[in-house]
């Protein structure tokens, strides 16, 4: 009987773990991408290769973006973005923070989805700006959930005092125009630990 009680206790603890665990971002399965527009009609999609993040038991979500990991497919452009726009030596990371109610997410059956509309903050180059995000949370299995943007989050260069840097980038690249509004999309996978 003692063995049966121990087995029951272990099973209950295993089932309860995701509801009380911290959730950690799976960088390999996650993606944060952005779209740049130049010369008024040429749009290109880029991404950041290194992300860190977690959602704690109270629902505080934090994603850290290593801005040095920007990847556009063109090394010279990557270097210009690192130096002129992100200023990675002074500001090596950007942060995204939000407060989630984890109860509905934890209650989802595998494969079930939940639309979320919530405020989040983006901190970039020492400035912080708030946005309203439309997200879709999907419970993948007992130990993983996914959050994707239903609509791109449009980041404006002016919100982070970056307009002069975008113009410097435009001049360095010999372009007639570079959009100061940048749509950002995300697919984030979190795993319970």
Residues covered by each model-derived region:
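Low-complexity, acidic/polar, glycine-enriched regions of mature
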Residues: 21-193
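Sec-dependent N-terminal signal peptides
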Residues: 7-15
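Positively charged n-region of N-terminal signal peptides that target proteins for export
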Residues: 1-7
